[in-house]
């Protein structure tokens, strides 16, 4: 049963990556009795909400597609506002109140890392579609990602600039207050 749920979570996360432009309201569908609850955490409001809304909509679309083929899952998502403390509080609500069996999210690296550590302690399967910090999956064997890491992206950009564009030097402009920007710049 756990492997089947993990397969659904992985499929939903992969479809989320392909469908991030779809629109929906981002709320949970609790209308199906007996449905297996899959949790979601994403910044649905705030500065990075564009990423959370897109990912959340893709996950909901994937769950809907899976259910259209005879399965019975429900997606319960909460807005963590791009904040690690909010993410932990929402995660605890998903586990305690909503009784989720797996988690898709978080979307950005700081909240994702905080939740990953707790999910590992709780033996909760978790996958992030977009959390790129290396430390996320180092939280444990229950934590997965469906995207490239910061170092990989930075190295690929540097390789492209050097090998394809012929650049011998580069000036890197980055935001020192943003972990994603720092991670890419350091690897470049």
Where do the protein language model's features map onto the residues?
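Short, low-complexity disordered leader/linker segments with a strong preference
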Residues: 1-37, 67-69, 121
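Beta-alpha junction/loop-to-helix N-cap segments that form part of ligand/metal-binding clefts
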Residues: 26-30, 51-55, 65-136, 146
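Short beta-strand segments enriched in small/hydrophobic residues
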Residues: 34-56, 106, 169-175
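Short, solvent-exposed amphipathic alpha-helices that sit
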Residues: 51-66, 86, 126, 153-156, ...
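Amphipathic, non-transmembrane alpha-helical secondary structure
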Residues: 60, 85-96, 113, 155-163, ...
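Glycine-rich, charge-decorated loop segments at or immediately adjacent to ligand/cofactor-binding or catalytic sites
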Residues: 137-141
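An alpha-beta-alpha
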Residues: 143-188
């Amino acid at each position: 049963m756990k492997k089947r749920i993990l397969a659904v979570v992985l499929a939903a996360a992969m479809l989320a990556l392909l469908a991030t432009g779809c629109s929906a309201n981002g709320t949970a569908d609790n209308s199906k009795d007996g449905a297996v609850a899959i949790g979601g955490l994403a910044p649905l409001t705030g500065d990075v909400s564009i990423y959370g809304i897109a990912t959340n909509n893709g996950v909901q679309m994937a769950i809907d597609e899976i259910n259209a083929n005879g399965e019975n899952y429900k997606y319960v998502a909460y807005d963590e506002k791009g904040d690690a403390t909010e993410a932990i509080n929402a995660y605890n609500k998903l586990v305690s109140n909503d009784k989720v069996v797996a988690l898709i999210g978080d979307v950005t690296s700081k909240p994702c890392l905080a939740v990953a550590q707790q999910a590992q302690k709780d033996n909760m399967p978790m996958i992030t579609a977009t959390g790129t910090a290396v430390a996320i999956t180092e939280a444990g064997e229950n934590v997965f990602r469906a995207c490239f890491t910061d170092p990989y992206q930075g190295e690929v950009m540097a390789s492209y600039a050097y090998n394809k564009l012929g650049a011998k030097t580069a000036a890197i402009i980055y935001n020192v207050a943003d972990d994603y920007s720092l991670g890419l710049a350091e690897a470049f």
